[in-house]
């Protein structure tokens, strides 16, 4: 689900969240965004 990478990808307060994005893409999602410092994958 959207939480595939929530515990595996750090989310900084500012900047581009590349670790989240990469983790989500590897998990088969379109990408990822950070919400309250947690990585959420786009379906």
From Swiss-Prot:
**Transmembrane residue ranges:** none
Q: Which Pfam families match?
A: Toxin_17
| GO cellular-component term (any) | extracellular region
The record's SUPFAM superfamilies line, in alphabetical order, gives: Scorpion toxin-like (SSF57095)
Q: In this UniProt entry, which cysteines form S-S bonds?
A: 5-23, 11-34, 20-39, 24-41
InterPro entries recorded: Ergtoxin (IPR012622), Scorpion_toxin-like_sf (IPR036574)
Task: State where it is primarily located.
Answer: secreted
Tissue specificity, per the record, is: Expressed by the venom gland.
Q: Which PROSITE patterns match?
A: ERGTX (PS60026)
Gene3D superfamilies registered for this protein in UniProt:
Knottin, scorpion toxin-like (3.30.30.10)
Localization per record = Secreted
Keyword set, alphabetical order = Disulfide bond, Ion channel impairing toxin, Knottin, Neurotoxin, Potassium channel impairing toxin, Secreted, Toxin, Voltage-gated potassium channel impairing toxin
Q: Name one GO molecular function term.
A: toxin activity
The task this protein performs is described as: Blocks Kv11/ERG potassium channels (tested in MMQ lactotroph cells that contain the three ERG channels: rKv11.1/KCNH2/ERG1, rKv11.2/KCNH6/ERG2 and rKv11.3/KCNH7/ERG3). This toxin can be used to distinguish slow deactivating components (ERGS) from fast deactivating components (ERGF) currents, since it specifically blocks ERGS.
Record-stated family: Belongs to the ergtoxin family. Gamma-KTx 3 subfamily.
Comment block on domains: The presence of a 'disulfide through disulfide knot' structurally defines this protein as a knottin. Has the CSalpha/beta fold, which comprises one or two short alpha helices connected to anti-parallel beta-sheets stabilized by three or four disulfide bonds.
What is the name of this protein? Potassium channel toxin gamma-KTx 3.1
Q: Which organism is it from?
A: Centruroides noxius (Mexican scorpion)
